[in-house]
A protein has these predicted regions:
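Helix N-cap motif at beta-to-alpha junctions
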Residues: 15-16, 69-73
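N-terminal beta-strand motif that seeds the catalytic metal site of vicinal oxygen chelate
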Residues: 1-17, 48, 62-65, 123-125
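Conserved short beta-strand elements that form part of the metal-binding/catalytic scaffold
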Residues: 30-63, 69, 87-88, 105, ...
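Vicinal oxygen chelate
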Residues: 1-2, 67, 77-125
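Short Gly/charged-rich anion-binding patches and loops
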Residues: 18-19, 36, 74
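Amphipathic alpha-helical segments
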Residues: 17-30
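A generic "structured core" feature
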Residues: 15, 24, 39-41, 76, ...
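Short amphipathic alpha-helices within nucleic acid-binding modules
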Residues: 22, 61, 73-78
Length: 125
């Protein structure tokens, strides 16, 4: 029934300008402000991401957006250079000093937050 539709992602923030700068300058996406309340972020493969202003915004407690990458170590280093702070987790996930969880049998993952406190992740399979 919905297989012919184009799904998109959306979540909220409490600071549109900081969030716009982060997705544009740090992550490198094209970002357009719409109606003074919405950010339209153009993700790869023409997938839109809508980030909307919400006065009583509460960050999601789960990962809202995952980026599948080829070289997680290199990207983590580049994002750290741009000021991104990666999350640190203990067992059973256990991240290293840079914030990367190295899974010998699966995906390597590193989590970080956008200015609204929403959790994003880099994943290398």
């Amino acid at each position: 029934m919905l297989e012919q539709t184009t799904p998109f992602f959306s979540f909220s923030t409490n600071n549109l300008e900081e969030t716009r700068q982060f997705y544009e300058s740090v992550l490198g996406f094209e970002v357009e402000v719409r109606r003074d309340r919405f950010l339209h972020v153009q993700l790869p493969e023409n997938r839109p991401l809508i980030i909307y202003y919400k006065e009583n915004h509460s960050p999601a407690s789960y990962t809202v957006l995952n980026f599948q990458v080829q070289d997680i170590g290199m990207l983590v280093d580049r994002l750290i250079e741009k000021g991104v702070i990666f999350e640190q987790y203990g067992p059973p996930i256990q991240t290293d000093a840079k914030g990367i969880s190295w899974d010998e049998e699966g995906s390597h993952i590193a989590w970080f937050k956008d200015p609204g406190g929403n959790i994003l992740a880099l994943i290398e399979n």
